[in-house]
């Protein structure tokens, strides 16, 4: 297969974003110690951090023994539970603080960011257990509907929680919005091959994170680890997957959509052209990334209201 020409696929704004990102978090960051990876990742996130919108109130709280951060802009019956990205190795409440604050301000919903424990200090299923424990406690605290959301590793956790909650927490999850999630798709298929060496994330990077997360050989057939390894995709909440064209994980959104539709559910996959993994941070530098963030917030807002966001489909 011919290698993609990223000089053509990516516009000047995305290249400028990637150069800025690489100043803090270099392409070979996985070769650093875990401590150093976290340090440079945190510096990168701080460099891109935007001022919180007016009116958003934040409070660090604990749910189910897991540290969380709550964002509110007024009373709301809907709670968005957000799981941050970072390969299960880096990231936390501060890395995605501005993203959560903006979702809160623009949707009007309560947003709770979950600071699940990271690998290698806690290996699988530790991160999932934290994600699900926080979900259960949040669902017990707030009586209204819940929208699950997350990016990259956090998209994996959001989907894993949705799968595990079936038959256990009934009628509460109004939808899930997964942003360039890693769901455990076929590594010999689609974007895994076509964009194996994409800027910002490569399949080699992914293999590193999988080894660290699992503490060795990744488990097989466990949807808590890889939601696409489930054998039953019925009964899942309405699902919107938004991925980046130039990302080895993009095909996971398509595969997951197809599995849910085949099981009779509602699902939508949008592949954003000319974007790369991690583009949420580019939303103030790139018109394409900003437009995608608009779609992400639109999907969350619609699902929370009980609507299907059909208007999000790209023209």
Question: What is each model feature region?
Answer:
Residues 1-71, 219, 305-315:
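A glycine/proline-hinged amphipathic helix-loop "lid/cap" segment
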Residues 65-78, 228-233:
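Short beta-strand-to-loop junctions in surface cap/lid or active-site-entrance loops
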Residues 77-86:
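Short beta-strand element of the alpha/beta-hydrolase
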Residues 87, 116-123, 183, 276:
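Alpha/beta-hydrolase active-site loop signature
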Residues 92-93, 99, 112-145, 283-289:
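Catalytic nucleophile-loop/oxyanion-hole region of alpha/beta-hydrolase
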Residues 102-109:
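A short, Lys/Arg-enriched amphipathic alpha-helix followed by its capping loop at the start of a domain
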Residues 150, 154, 158:
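Gly/Ala-rich beta-loop-alpha elbow adjacent to hydrolase catalytic centers
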Residues 159-315:
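Alpha/beta hydrolase fold serine-hydrolase catalytic domain that processes acyl esters and thioesters
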């Amino acid at each position: 297969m011919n290698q993609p020409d990223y000089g053509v696929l990516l516009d000047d704004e995305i290249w400028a974003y990637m150069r800025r990102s690489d100043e803090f978090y270099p392409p070979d960051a996985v070769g650093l110690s875990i401590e150093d990876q976290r340090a440079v990742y945190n510096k990168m996130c701080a460099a891109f951090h935007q001022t919180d919108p007016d009116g958003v109130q934040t409070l660090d709280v604990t749910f189910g023994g897991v540290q969380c951060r709550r964002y509110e802009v007024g009373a709301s019956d809907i709670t968005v539970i957000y799981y941050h990205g970072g390969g299960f190795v880096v990231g936390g409440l501060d890395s995605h603080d501005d993203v959560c604050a903006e979702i809160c301000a623009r949707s009007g919903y309560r947003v709770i960011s979950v600071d699940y424990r990271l690998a290698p200090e806690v290996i699988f299923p530790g991160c999932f257990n934290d994600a699900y424990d926080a979900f259960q406690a949040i669902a017990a605290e707030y009586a209204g509907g819940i929208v699950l959301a997350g990016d990259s590793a956090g998209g994996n956790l959001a989907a894993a929680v949705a799968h595990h909650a079936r038959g256990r927490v009934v009628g509460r999850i109004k939808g899930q919005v997964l942003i360039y999630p890693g769901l455990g798709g076929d590594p010999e298929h689609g974007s895994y091959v076509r964009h194996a060496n994409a800027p910002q994330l490569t399949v080699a990077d992914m293999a590193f994170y999988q080894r660290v997360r699992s503490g060795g050989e990744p488990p097989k057939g466990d949807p808590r680890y890889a939601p696409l390894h489930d054998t039953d995709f019925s009964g899942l909440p309405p699902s919107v997957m938004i991925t980046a064209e130039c990302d080895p994980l993009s095909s996971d959104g398509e595969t997951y959509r197809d599995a849910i539709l085949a099981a009779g559910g509602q699902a939508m996959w949008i592949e954003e052209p000319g974007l790369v993994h991690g583009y949420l941070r580019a939303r103030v530098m790139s018109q394409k990334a900003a437009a995608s963030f608009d779609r992400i917030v639109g999907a969350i807002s619609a699902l929370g209201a009980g609507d299907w966001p059909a208007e999000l489909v790209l023209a």
